[in-house]
Amino acid sequence: MDEISYQKFLTTKIRDLELDVDESMAPFFKRLKKELKDHRILLWPDFYFGNEWGCENKTISISIPFFLATPELKTLEGDETKNEEMMKILRHETGHAINYSYKLWQQKDWKEIFGDFNKKYRKGYLYRVNPWSKSYVRHLHYLGDPHYAQKHPDEDWAETFAIWLDPRSHWDVKYRNWPNALEKLSYVDRIMEEISGREPLHTKRKQDGIYSMIEETVSE
């Protein structure tokens, strides 16, 4: 991109950028699709570029930060997300989408293992975590969100699912001395076997904060 083109790029409104989530995220989506296919999980989330990471509550829509779309945007944002870190977050958010699409959070066993899905998120959860607990897996923990699984039952599920889905996690070995965390991982393994090959029950979409609605320019 030459200097003139770059200056024009900086003054372009984000909503006017031509971003293609499938094209930009192709190598990561390829890996994720294979991991899901290996377990015959039929859901493919509704990915889109938005303001930040997140799965819209009780939908299959997952927002990916728009600045991950191109090298130029990543450089401006100062983003240094590595490939494996990207996969960790994608697995986590996909865990939310699967929870919602198959309504797993409504099942008695899910509630007994992870807790009340309708529990309100509280600010400052880090002041209440048990840093020595072996009841929770550690996943986004290593990406700057310490003890994230302790934040809320839905996050506990998503973190546990993400480790289970990672073909290189060796969760049955890594967590063999963490009985409560291992119980959660074993539950994920069991419930995913149950929904294997089954169509999702719920495929509501909601692309909140989609990049095409962002009025700011790239430089802003």
Regions found by a protein language model. Name each.
Residues D2-M25:
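Fold-level signature of zinc-dependent metallopeptidase catalytic domains
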Residues E72-R91, P146-A149:
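Short pre-active-site segment immediately N-terminal to the catalytic Zn-binding motif
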Residues H139-H147:
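Flexible glycine/proline-enriched surface loops and loop-helix/loop-strand junctions
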